[in-house]
Amino acid sequence: MMTKTQINKLIKMMNDLDYPFEAPLKESFIESIIQIEFNSNSTNCLEKLCNEVSILFKNQPDYLTFLRAMDGFEVNGLRLFSLSIPEPSVKNLFAVNEFYRNNDDFINPDLQERLVIGDYSISIFTYDIKGDAANLLI
């Protein structure tokens, strides 16, 4: 599990280097996501995303610990997306996933089954809810 010490070191490094990061995710926001009842038959994109984020929170406590310290960041091109801020200094997880799943140009079938949580240059960080695993797609 990610410790508070590791997170505090990350925050200190980011402050020292003047990298942007978002304030911690509010506990009420976290609870609202955790309490969502999973509905695998939903056809609404936002509802599906909320379901997947709820599973991510339950299966990956380190990610939740991280969000309680900062809601996204950007360092040297590496971004972990914000969950609660629509137009942050780092991208919003819900907006990014909606784009990857519902755009008129191209829909990547690999991203239909994964939750995009960040990116780095040309790579995309995803979470596979079925396999309970983080992945890097190039």
Swiss-Prot record:
Record-given protein name: Putative uncharacterized protein YrhA
Organism encoding this protein: Escherichia coli (strain K12)
